[in-house]
Curated annotation (Swiss-Prot):
GO terms for molecular function: bent DNA binding; DNA-binding transcription repressor activity; minor groove of adenine-thymine-rich DNA binding; protein dimerization activity; structural constituent of chromatin; transcription cis-regulatory region binding. It comes from the Bacteria. Pfam families: Histone_HNS (PF00816), Histone_HNS_N (PF22470). GO terms for cellular component: cytosol; nucleoid; protein-DNA complex. InterPro entries: H-NS-like_N, H-NS_C_dom, H-NS_C_dom_sf, Histone_HNS, Histone_HNS_N. It comes from Yersinia enterocolitica. SUPFAM superfamilies: H-NS histone-like proteins (SSF81273). The keyword Cytoplasm applies. Keywords: Coiled coil, Cytoplasm, DNA-binding, Repressor, Transcription, Transcription regulation. The gene is hns. This is DNA-binding protein H-NS.
């Protein structure tokens, strides 16, 4: 809550601040505050009306489904299955494309994606080898 709202929410602070203002100024501030409060009430009532309308429509559609012999839970389950099938599945790991021996003497493989292993990079730059020399 901001300092201005804390002042407006505290009656003692309001009284102290009101002593420094004229009655006309206080009445003008009261009118403006009433306008803001009325606007907020309208917004809240409109939001509540939208929620009630949505609830009414959902109930109406539920009754229509039941009248047509469809259980709403059955529809939800069918939609969940469809949604699960539409979600992205993990792609399969790429097969290794290159083979090399690292600094420890271990044979390793590389798919060709991502950063080039340091051993391969060094061999290409310093020994003049090509990437084809490391193909499986």
């Amino acid at each position: 809550m901001s300092e201005a709202l804390k002042i407006l929410n505290n009656i003692r602070t309001l009284r102290a601040q009101a002593r420094e203002c004229t009655l006309e100024t206080l009445e003008e501030m009261l009118e403006k505050l009433e306008v803001v409060v009325n606007e907020r009430r309208e917004e809240d009532s409109q939001a509540q009306a939208e929620i009630e309308e949505r609830t009414r429509k959902l109930q109406q559609y539920r009754e229509m489904l039941i009248a047509d012999g469809i259980d709403p839970n059955e529809l939800l389950n069918a939609m969940a299955v469809t949604k699960a099938a539409a979600t992205k599945s993990k792609r399969a790991a790429r097969p290794a494309k290159y083979k090399y021996i690292d600094e420890n003497g271990e044979t390793k493989t590389w798919t060709g994606q991502g950063r080039t292993p340091a051993v391969i990079k060094k061999a290409i730059e310093e020994q003049g080898k090509s990437l084809d020399d490391f193909l499986l």
